[in-house]
């Protein structure tokens, strides 16, 4: 349960202010309240659902989370969070000093929602190209389909948390190391 709250604390607080113009939240989310509920749902999925191996168990847990949202927050917020919203900490461009042109912060970390998966895919493709340019030995040549993108986002979330860790299990050659390199 503490991991859910740790994930909630990672989020950028400015996104929760009412009466302020916000950039798009992603999915069907239209309000700061919906954004908080979407973040809570996302963190519950990362903490509880990602550990399950059976699709039946995952579906049951998903429906339970959705039922809790409906019972607790009402129909309006339930509709806002029906569509999944993905949260990542690598969407922001590097911070550059206007006067000198120096890079002040190469990878600013703000845990926030992505508007859609295409935006994350485009950014991951550009990060992969930058990695390939800078690495002399290891090259990444990944096809980033939806499952690969969501796995990469999960790994990036774990790496951004204090004492975050993961045990990556899978068949050799399935992309565990490559996705971790990209997420880092």
Residue ranges and their predicted role:
Residues 160-179:
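Walker A/P-loop nucleotide-binding motif
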Residues 1-163:
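Alpha-helical lid/collar subdomain of P-loop NTPases
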Residues 182:
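Active-site signature of alpha/beta-hydrolase-fold catalytic machinery across serine-
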């Amino acid at each position: 349960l503490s991991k859910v709250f740790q994930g909630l604390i990672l989020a950028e607080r400015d996104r929760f202010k009412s009466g302020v113009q916000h950039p798009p939240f992603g999915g069907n989310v239209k309000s700061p309240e919906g954004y908080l509920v979407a973040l809570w749902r996302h963190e519950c999925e990362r903490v509880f659902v990602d550990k399950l191996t059976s699709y039946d168990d995952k579906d049951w847990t998903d429906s339970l989370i959705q039922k809790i949202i409906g019972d607790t927050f009402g129909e309006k917020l339930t509709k806002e969070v029906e569509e999944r919203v993905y949260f990542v900490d690598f969407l922001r461009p590097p911070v550059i000093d206007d006067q000198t042109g120096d890079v002040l912060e190469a990878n600013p970390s703000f845990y926030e929602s992505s508007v859609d998966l295409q935006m994350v895919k485009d950014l991951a493709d550009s990060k992969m190209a930058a990695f390939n340019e800078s690495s002399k030995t290891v090259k990444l040549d990944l096809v980033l389909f939806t499952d690969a993108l969501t796995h990469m986002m999960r790994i990036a979330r774990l790496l951004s948390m204090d004492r975050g860790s993961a045990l990556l299990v899978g068949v050799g050659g399935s992309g565990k190391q490559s996705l971790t390199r990209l997420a880092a």
